[in-house]
């Protein structure tokens, strides 16, 4: 509880399994009556070149399971309640890598690109029932997920607080997409000069 009357409730869930997602969704519906806002932020990242992944197909399956199917299953479990109330907002945390086609992140970027595409379709389908969808193409954030990659010690990153500010902006203003200047530059460069972009990356 806080001085403004808000109450924070936490609940642990395994979003890497369908059973875990279903249990979490059922808990949200039972305890909270559904959700007005859903932020799909759980995910995993794998940095490995495609040539080094020929015998690691499971990396793609595991990454898709939580980054795409987990978010999709949670969203579809809560959408009926949002539709019944004719209001709701789904914020899907994607990656700057989708805009820049980051090499050696094919499993991760593909999973986030799939979520981006689904979000765009859902936004069109639910536009007339008061449900909004926002994609946040998040840059690198200084979290334990990127710690094993020493290269990122010299790359611009956001603090967790700055990343949180982007999510708050998504909740308040409900844009279709939030992307940083670097992400937008990468997307434009790949669109206008793809060969140059590939060399630069």
Cite the ranges covered by each PLM segment.
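Conserved mid-core segment of classical short-chain dehydrogenase/reductases
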Residues: 22, 45-61, 104
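Residue(s) in the substrate-gating loop at a strand-loop-helix junction
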Residues: 95
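The beta1-alpha1 cofactor-binding region of Rossmann-like NAD(H)/NADP(H)-dependent oxidoreductases
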Residues: 12-23, 57
């Amino acid at each position: 509880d806080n001085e403004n009357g808000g109450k924070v409730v936490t609940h642990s869930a395994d979003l890497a399994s369908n059973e875990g997602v279903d249990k979490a969704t059922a808990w949200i519906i039972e305890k909270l009556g559904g959700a007005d806002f859903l932020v799909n932020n759980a995910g995993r990242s794998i940095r490995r070149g495609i040539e080094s992944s020929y015998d690691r197909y499971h990396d793609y399956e595991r990454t898709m399971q939580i980054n795409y199917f987990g978010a999709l299953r949670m969203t579809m479990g809560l959408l009926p309640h949002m539709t019944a109330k004719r209001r709701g907002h789904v914020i899907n945390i994607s990656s700057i890598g989708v805009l820049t086609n980051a090499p050696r992140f094919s499993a991760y970027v593909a999973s986030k690109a799939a979520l981006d595409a689904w979000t765009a379709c859902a936004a069109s389908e639910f536009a007339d029932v008061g449900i909004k969808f926002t994609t946040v193409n998040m840059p690198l954030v200084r979290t334990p997920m990127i710690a094993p990659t020493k290269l990122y010690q010299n790359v611009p990153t956001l603090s967790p607080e700055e990343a949180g500010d982007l999510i708050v902006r998504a909740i308040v203003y409900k844009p279709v997409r939030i992307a940083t200047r670097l992400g937008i530059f990468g997307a434009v460069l790949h669109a206008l000069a793809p060969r140059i972009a590939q060399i630069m990356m």
